[in-house]
Amino acid sequence: TTTMSRCRGCVNHCVLTINRFEGGRQYISGNRCERGLGVEKAKRDIPNLFTWKYHRLFDYEPLTADKATRGVVGIPRVLNMYENFPYWATFFKELGFRVMLSPQSSHQIYELGIETIPSESECYPAKLAHGHISWLIKRDVPFIFYPCIPYERKEVPGAGNHYNCPMVTSYSENIKNNMEELKEKDVKFLNPFMAFTSEEILSKQLQEVFKKEFDIPESETKKAAKKAWNELAQARTDVEKKGEEVLQYLKDTGKHGIVLAGRPYHIDPEINHGIADMITSYGFAVLTEDSVSHLGKVERPLVVTDQ
């Protein structure tokens, strides 16, 4: 007999075809990894830096309600936050805001904002942003912070540029102009244009914005920005150290690894469709490009834009 089922082992929800034969034997197809087979996943000790980095970036303890003297700020777990959340988590905590981060992406999150997506041609990571904002609004968050970031830090000296793609740069403008919920619920939606070009430039921009919007003394904002910049640097250092640990693990064990390159938000399980888990299920370690890029030397000039 043949029956259909759906695996619930990960966000892929693979459709399984189960063929049962006489004698109790069965053959399962449609699965992308071993989970759908009902077999205990082998080699759980294989490093997966997609998963490790995801938790390093987002596992920050927010202030308790009694210590949040300036209230709650909602931050969507989207796009540029996969590069800079350590900064914002620290910055707002230092200023006395309790950070409410939207949950891990899922199809349910996507469906929350589907009616406000202005174009089907947008990439899926951008479409998810609508759902994350909607989730925050439904939690009665009075203030949402989602800045426009045209420029990130320059990764290496000599890089051709350090700008974000247009969607990452200004998608919060799209949100502001297409989500009527923000106005209906009287949510303060703050999306200033800022740049991570340098610590000084970003700090100055933040001092101006938070003086204007919340009357926070510039000296206080400057101090918070300093701690936030240091935490962002520490997060990046931790990723590099973890990459070195995995390389040493590969040398010690004789195993193989794969550098799974992509944009920062590709560590989102809903976006990467579990490809990192699939790779580790075959016994390969998974490294992110930023966990090992500091170990190499780029021969210049390049024939592509390096940023």
Regions found by a protein language model. Name each.
Residues 1-307:
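An N-terminal assembly and electron-transfer interface module characteristic of large anaerobic redox
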